[in-house]
Design a protein with these regions (language model features):
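Mid-to-C-terminal alpha-helical segments outside catalytic/metal-binding sites
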Residues: 1-3, 18, 24-32, 179, ...
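Catalytic pocket-lining loop regions of alpha/beta-barrel enzymes
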Residues: 90-190
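Structured loop/turn residues at beta-strand edges in well-structured enzyme cores
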Residues: 75-78, 154, 218
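Catalytic metal-binding/acid-base residues of hydrolase active sites
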Residues: 6, 39, 137, 165-166, ...
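Mid-domain alpha/beta scaffold segments of enzyme catalytic cores
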Residues: 1-103, 114, 141-143, 209
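A generic "structured core" feature
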Residues: 1-8, 12-13, 92, 96, ...
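Conserved, mostly hydrophobic/aromatic
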Residues: 4, 56, 100, 135, ...
Length: 237
């Protein structure tokens, strides 16, 4: 179960941020996955629903008090993301993040390392909502990220996606993955590829091998499948 992939088609929807290197067809995906909205302009959610993935993490502007009840009623929507990277919306989205708990939806938090202190405060204020940290908080260096991640992990409502590191970290990514596994525990870590963004720096097989190589036999079932099923309310296969 890949807990973080993107689908897009620039001929259908507009993605102003998408680099030219990613504006081409990629290989077909075969497997179970959670598809995360890629912040296109237009009705991206309806387009994704027509593709019939197993689960969608839908974009929602939580600071604008969207109709979360209607969003939760869409069968494929299993989580919500409001991109916080590059914003100062943590206070503005707080009530929306809290409301997600009432609808049984987790919140995917995509932030950068410098925003970890704000996410720590948000997680504490929204302790009934499951918060999914995307890409380990996009670290740039082990310190001060290491201490900040440990503090965030102290909030038991937070889980961590082992995803997206190769486009953020220069050099060996294993110390970052090892630290995340240590502070969160394998039962609160989810494998994600961030595909096809990750294709800029690695292959799918290489990333899966790196993550799998750090897990014991007993940990693999959780990190590679069962934890994502639990967090996003999916049926076990």
């Amino acid at each position: 179960m890949d807990a973080h992939i993107h689908f897009w088609d620039p001929s259908v929807l507009e993605y102003p941020w998408l680099p030219d290197a990613l504006r081409h067809p990629h290989v077909e995906f075969e497997g179970r996955a959670v598809v995360v909205e890629a912040d296109a302009r237009g009705d991206e959610l309806s387009w994704l629903e027509r593709l019939e993935p197993e689960a969608i993490v839908a974009h929602a502007p939580l600071e604008e008090k969207p109709d979360l009840e209607a969003l939760a009623a869409r069968p494929l929507v299993k989580g919500v993301r409001r991109l916080l990277q590059g914003t100062d919306l943590f206070d503005a989205v707080r009530e929306g993040v809290r409301e997600l708990a009432r609808h049984g939806l987790p919140f995917d938090a995509c932030i950068t390392q410098d925003q970890l202190p704000k996410l720590i405060a948000l997680a504490a204020a929204c302790d009934e909502t499951t918060i999914v940290l995307d890409h380990l908080g996009k670290p740039r260096a082990l310190d001060p990220w290491r201490a900040q991640l440990a503090e965030l992990a102290g909030n038991e409502n937070v889980v961590c996606k082992l995803s997206g590191l190769t486009t953020e970290v220069t050099g060996d990514v294993r110390p970052y993955l090892e630290h995340a596994l240590e502070v969160f525990g394998s039962d609160r870590c989810l494998f994600g590829s961030d595909w096809p963004v990750a294709s800029l720096t690695t292959t799918y097989e290489q990333w899966l091998d790196v993550v799998s190589g750090l897990l014991s036999e007993g940990e693999r079932g959780g990190v590679l499948a069962a934890n994502a099923e639990r967090v996003y309310g999916l049926t076990r296969v």
